[in-house]
From Swiss-Prot:
<dbReference type="InterPro" id="IPR005372">
    <property type="entry name" value="UPF0182"/>
</dbReference>
<feature type="transmembrane region" description="Helical">
    <location>
        <begin position="264"/>
        <end position="284"/>
    </location>
</feature>
<feature type="region of interest" description="Disordered">
    <location>
        <begin position="977"/>
        <end position="1019"/>
    </location>
</feature>
<feature type="transmembrane region" description="Helical">
    <location>
        <begin position="213"/>
        <end position="233"/>
    </location>
</feature>
<keyword id="KW-1133">Transmembrane helix</keyword>
<feature type="transmembrane region" description="Helical">
    <location>
        <begin position="61"/>
        <end position="81"/>
    </location>
</feature>
<feature type="transmembrane region" description="Helical">
    <location>
        <begin position="291"/>
        <end position="311"/>
    </location>
</feature>
<feature type="compositionally biased region" description="Pro residues">
    <location>
        <begin position="1006"/>
        <end position="1019"/>
    </location>
</feature>
<comment type="similarity">
    <text>Belongs to the UPF0182 family.</text>
</comment>
<keyword id="KW-0472">Membrane</keyword>
<feature type="transmembrane region" description="Helical">
    <location>
        <begin position="19"/>
        <end position="39"/>
    </location>
</feature>
<protein>
    <recommendedName>
        <fullName>UPF0182 protein Krad_1193</fullName>
    </recommendedName>
</protein>
<dbReference type="GO" id="GO:0005576">
    <property type="term" value="C:extracellular region"/>
</dbReference>
<dbReference type="GO" id="GO:0005886">
    <property type="term" value="C:plasma membrane"/>
</dbReference>
<dbReference type="Pfam" id="PF03699">
    <property type="entry name" value="UPF0182"/>
</dbReference>
<feature type="transmembrane region" description="Helical">
    <location>
        <begin position="115"/>
        <end position="135"/>
    </location>
</feature>
<feature type="region of interest" description="Disordered">
    <location>
        <begin position="897"/>
        <end position="934"/>
    </location>
</feature>
Length: 1019
């Protein structure tokens, strides 16, 4: 038989080609991955180096690499060694049986792939082990740099630092080694069974000597690790809740007298059984270790489960108060210490509910500081009056800060940064050149007085406009780093960045970035690295990237601080301030632990979620869902809005957790003494810290163990009364509010963060929302370089006695809405269904010996350019409710014609929803023309007529005179029609504020030198 010479060569060639193709593809994929990963790491090195935090990055990186390597090697080796031993220790002559005959087929099928299977399984175990170990870099670093707390627990006499730093690392080591032994045991069992070293049936010994030594050794190692786990469980009882006393963390009576001894006994039994397995490894029988294992299981059930249950059921439950009080007291003390609540100043406040003339005379300094501007409502007013162009935007929720007044005092202010908004560009402007090299930054901070308004109900600004102007000496208004800057920008090298709109021929002033922020991107290598990092070829190809260019990325303040300090938990609200003529973002950082002995655990996400965090588009975020039982506001951070420079300051330098991190990253955190006075005066007590503390205080304001066990005096944070909740749903919590007020124990008003409390639902079956507590924390950090004010951080808690009945916020809001006078005014503000009424934040103030509620009411017409205007103010004291154009008038009405304290807004005219918005960005806007003035007069007259008609209607109904009632209703309809017509004329003739359509058109955008015009640039 003859064969064609080409016949056999073709399949061989195909096999060789297929065989060579697979490694080539694998190598190419590996090279691509390596290049991309290398580019990202290189970019990170440049980014951290530019900020001066390169040691932080390298320490974390190399520690993660080390842990990944060790973890991967350990688990991979455990699996590989067990599989290899199982194969090499296979018997030469396996007994003949049906079981072995069936396994022979599997052995034959597996043999060609045996080594590959070992490699794949070992690699999978290694990847799992490496990823788990790598994630514990913080645990290792804290243990390595641990410090003492200086106090010891009463149970084991161990320093608190042992539980916070050492115990988590030891527990991880034991659990990780246990996982390695378990995987090795599973692999060993499978290998020995497959290759005949372990049999389930047949005559004679069921294991070979080699299999017995291997498996018994692994069992002994597992039991020794289990013994270590039992021993550590004793200490972990200090940081967990056994459930014997609901919600109480730390050992209770049953834990101390039953669980702790049982853990020690089980640890001893596990060691004994481990020795029995060692004996089995050198002996010939599994009998003793099998008996020992059974004894361990029975002991775990009887000693570890049944005995503690019996002690709890028959000894503790009948005597709960006497036996558990000692341990509940330890939990109360430790929890208050862990959340920095040990020094809360508590006083009983028998609030007066009767209003009388002059009652607020002692609070004459507080009343003028009442903040009427609601930061969660007035964003649209800022946008319409100060937005200027569509590519500028303010946050949905604005911030509260303080600024000096000409008389040397301070005033609460609502602040917002005018940030870049690329979504506001027209479609034909959304090009790569425009978005990354032309529109690069926001401009200016807008500051409005918190306790005042303009004549038309819009905010009264003290710093505003473009170019910026005002009383606060803002010298560098450009915002290259802000909460809205989520894309990268390439700046420098060309004077073509749009700075702000002006009256020039092009319509815009331009600028060139000359700050130190960002990373150089002018060289070919730098372009390649960042092109790979962002997956954008334009960085490499565009002529807009010059040798002098710098790339700005990771630009939001929160992500910048989180990158340079990954060990911090960041507050959900960064706020802008003007410090030394520059815009600076201020953030708060927390050090936390979930291992503080005896302290109750808190879910950060739940505790910090409120009505603001659930508002769509809000810049205020809740903290991540994580359980902690220790928290400190240990760091204040700042981010320069122009350079992106990050500074970390040790705010609580007594915090042991911060001390450990400062040892781990020396030089990363500056001392408190480095904080300049100009920055200090803008630092405040953080919202999220207070939210967590107020959540803890709902239960831990009760310091008597017996009362704590009953739970009858627990509180809740009330729901936000301004949020409409559907039937059967729960309102989100009312957020805490920054207010300048004087607590009853204080001599002068202080900038504070406040909250209220109502009875817990399970402690108040009737569901009445009466007030039970009011808390305020001193938030004024002072203005002295490197020194916090003496009272900063002091929490003052007013507890209302059970005999005092003061309505809570939700009930007060219901009373306001059902009040006849308020309803009449709301109807006036909603004339012709062309307006909507918005209830602002309901503020609570402990003044006049009682509790005063103040709520601003905003009106907004339905026009495209309208915004909420502060139109009325409601004041409530006891059962007295008043609504007026000003707070001054409302207070006087509540307190019998004279409150005794002036609010300072007595001259404010009654604004309406239809007043047009100013166009020039200033508070007052241009003078209205005569037609507009006539319309305003006609609108006010119509509103007055409507008010009188409503009053006449009510009087006629009360008298039963339906003829007069019908006449009054006709006059009301006529007044409504007249008001609607006047409002329509105002909308047509009024000068409306800028909208997104005001953004630069294709023809008005400045061209890029050397490129096509900015309207249609191509990279």
């Amino acid at each position: 038989m003859s064969f064609s010479p080409r016949g056999p060569s073709r399949p061989v060639l195909r096999r060789r080609r297929r065989g060579a193709a697979l490694p080539t593809v694998v190598i190419l994929v590996a090279v691509v991955i390596a290049v991309v990963v290398g580019a990202r790491i290189t970019a990170d090195v440049w980014w951290f180096d530019q900020l001066g935090f390169l040691p932080t990055f390298t320490t974390k990186l190399w520690l993660q690499v080390l842990l990944f390597t060790l973890g991967a090697l350990l688990l991979a080796a455990a699996v590989a060694v067990s599989l290899t031993l199982g194969y090499r220790a296979r018997p030469i002559y396996a007994p003949v049986s049906d079981e072995q005959a069936g396994l022979d087929r599997y052995r034959e099928s597996l043999e060609p792939l045996r080594r590959l299977v070992v490699v794949v399984l070992s690699a999978a175990a290694g990847l799992f082990g490496g990823s788990v170990a790598m994630s514990r870099w913080e645990t290792l670093l804290l243990w390595w740099n641990r410090v003492d707390f200086g106090t010891r627990d009463e149970q084991f006499r161990m320093d608190q630092g042992f539980y916070v730093f050492t115990l988590p690392w030891l527990a991880f080591l034991v659990s990780f080694l246990t996982a390695a032994v378990v995987l090795a045991g599973i692999a060993g069992l499978a290998a020995h069974y497959l290759y005949g070293g372990l049999r389930l049936s047949g005559a004679g010994p069921r294991t070979t000597r080699a299999a017995r030594v291997h498996l018994a050794s692994l069992a002994a190692a597992f039991l020794l690790l289990r013994a270590a786990g039992y021993w550590l469980d004793r200490y972990e009882l200090m940081t967990t809740s056994s459930g014997y006393v609901r919600g109480v963390v730390g050992p209770t009576y049953t834990d101390v007298h039953a669980v702790l001894p049982s853990k020690a006994i089980l640890a001893l039994i596990a060691v004994v059984v481990a020795l029995l397995f060692v004996a089995a490894a050198v002996g010939t029988s599994w009998r003793l270790p099998a008996i020992g294992t059974g004894l361990l299981v029975v002991s775990a059930i009887a000693i570890g489960g049944i005995y503690p249950w019996a002690v709890q059921r028959f000894q503790v439950t009948p005597n709960r108060q006497s036996l558990e009080s000692e341990y509940v007291g330890k939990n109360i003390d430790a929890t208050r210490d862990a959340y920095d609540l040990s020094d809360v100043e508590v006083s009983t406040y028998a609030a007066d509910t009767t209003a009388s003339q002059g009652q607020l005379s002692e609070d004459a300094q507080t009343i003028p500081s009442v903040r009427l501007l609601d930061p969660s409502v007035v964003s649209q007013a800022f946008q319409q009056t100060q937005g200027q162009r569509g590519y500028y935007k303010f946050g949905e929720t604005l911030d509260v800060d303080r600024y000096a007044t000409p008389d040397g005092g301070t005033q609460d202010a609502v602040v917002a940064a005018r940030e870049l908004n690329l979504a506001g560009l027209a479609d034909n402007q959304r090009t790569w050149v425009n978005e990354h090299t032309i529109y690069t930054h926001g401009y200016g901070v807008v500051v409005a007085q918190g306790n005042d308004r303009a004549p038309d109900g819009s905010p009264s600004y003290v710093e505003a406009n473009v170019p910026t102007s005002g009383d606060l000496d803002l010298e560098q208004p450009r915002i290259y780093f802000g909460e809205g800057t989520t894309t990268y920008s390439i700046v420098g090298g060309r004077d073509n960045e749009i700075d702000y709109p002006d009256g020039s021929a092009g319509g815009f002033a331009t600028t060139e970035y000359d700050g130190s922020g960002g990373v150089a991107v002018g060289s070919l290598l730098q372009k390649l690295v960042y092109g790979l990092k962002f997956g954008d070829q334009n960085i490499l190809l565009s002529g807009s990237v010059t040798p002098e260019s710098r790339i700005l990325y990771d630009r939001t303040p929160r992500e910048r601080v989180e990158k340079v300090a990954p060990w911090l938990t960041m507050d959900g609200d960064a706020y802008p301030s003007i410090v030394d003529g520059r815009v600076v973002w201020i953030l708060d950082g927390y050090t936390t632990s979930n291992s503080y002995p005896y302290s109750a655990a808190t879910e950060l996400g739940d505790a910090t979620t409120d009505a603001l965090t659930q508002t769509q588009g809000s810049s205020v975020q809740a903290l991540q869902d994580r359980t902690v039982n220790y928290v400190r506001n240990s760091v204040k951070a700042t981010v320069d809005a122009y350079t992106g420079k990050v500074d970390l300051y040790a705010w609580d330098d007594t915090d042991p957790v911060l001390k450990a991190w400062m040892k781990a990253f020396p030089g990363a955190v500056e001392p408190l003494s480095a904080i300049d006075g100009s920055l200090m005066q803008h630092l405040r007590y953080p919202q999220d810290m207070f939210k967590v503390q107020r959540e803890v205080l709902t239960r831990y304001h009760v310091t008597d163990p017996a009362s704590f066990l009953t739970g009858q005096d627990f509180w809740d944070v009330p729901g936000d009364p301004t949020v409409d909740a559907a039937a059967g749903t729960v309102r989100p919590s009312q957020p805490p509010y920054y207010l300048t007020l004087r607590m009853p124990e204080q001599d002068t008003p202080t900038y504070s963060l406040t909250t209220t409390y109502v009875p817990a639902s399970n402690a108040n079956a009737s569901g009445t929302q009466v007030l039970r507590g009011f808390a305020a924390v001193d938030s004024d950090a002072g203005s002295t370089k490197g020194t916090k004010s003496e009272g900063y951080g002091t929490i003052r808690l007013l507890e209302l006695p059970q005999s005092t009945t003061v309505n809570g916020p939700v009930q007060i809001q219901n009373n306001i809405r059902s009040d006849t006078a308020v309803a009449d005014q709301v109807r006036l503000l909603s004339v012709g269904d062309n307006s909507r009424v918005i209830y602002g934040n309901l503020l609570t103030l402990p003044v006049g010996g009682g509790l005063l509620y103040v709520e601003p009411i905003y009106a907004q017409s339905t026009g495209d350019n309208s915004f909420p205007r502060l139109s009325r103010v409601v004041a409530v004291f006891g059962d007295n409710i008043a609504i007026a154009n000003t707070l001054d008038e409302a207070l006087d009405e509540v307190f019998g014609g004279n409150s005794g304290a002036g609010a300072g807004d007595e001259g404010a005219p009654p604004p309406t929803a239809g007043t047009p918005a100013p166009t020039d960005g200033a508070t007052g806007g241009p003078a209205p023309d005569p037609a507009t003035g006539d319309a305003q007069v006609q609108l006010q007259q119509a509103l007055d007529n409507a008010k009188r008609a409503i009053q006449d209607s009510s009087a006629a109904l009360a008298e039963g005179d339906f003829t007069k009632y019908g006449e009054a209703q006709q006059r009301l309809r006529a007044a409504v029609d007249a008001a609607s017509a006047a409002e329509a004329r105002l909308e047509r003739s009024g000068t409306s504020g800028p909208t997104s359509s005001s953004s630069p058109s294709a023809s008005s955008a400045p061209p890029v030198p050397g490129e096509t015009p900015a309207a249609t640039p191509t990279p």
